[in-house]
């Protein structure tokens, strides 16, 4: 289970809307599956179909997270024209990154009047499992 305070959920949706029509991306840090910090990361591809996190911003988030005694609990990004479900590209990127212990959170802007967020785990074989989000 991933625990996300409403302010972080709202921030992910706001970030997604601000970057639309391009995908946004970011990192959620915390402890024990509870989000305590959100880092907006620049999508260097500036694309509506894929994202690539700015390496320096990713490193800065990593260092800040470690300094605060936290860990990465999730990576998030938006899907601007499709459901909040990992694409084949998302799965490939997760496997290549080696970050298989974190959640992958997707924000769907497919219907901008009814945005929604889902969280997934991706294992070493590329299997996708939806995980529950507990919103505070």
Describe the function of each predicted region.
Residues 1-72, 83-136:
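Conserved beta-strand-loop surface patch within small alpha/beta domains used
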Residues 77-81:
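Histidine-centered divalent metal-coordination motifs
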């Amino acid at each position: 289970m991933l625990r996300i305070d409403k302010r972080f959920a709202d921030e992910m949706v706001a970030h997604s809307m601000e970057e639309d029509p391009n995908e946004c991306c970011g990192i959620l840090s915390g402890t024990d599956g509870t989000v305590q910090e959100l880092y907006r990361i620049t999508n260097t591809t500036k694309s509506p179909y894929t994202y690539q996190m700015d390496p320096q911003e990713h490193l800065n988030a990593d260092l800040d997270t470690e300094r605060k005694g936290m860990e990465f609990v999730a990576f998030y990004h938006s899907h601007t024209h499709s459901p909040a479900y990992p694409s084949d590209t998302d799965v490939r990127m997760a496997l290549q990154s080696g970050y298989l212990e974190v959640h992958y959170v997707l924000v769907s802007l497919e219907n901008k009047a009814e945005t929604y967020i889902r969280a997934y785990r991706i294992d070493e074989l590329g299997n996708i499992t939806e995980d529950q989000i507990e919103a505070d």
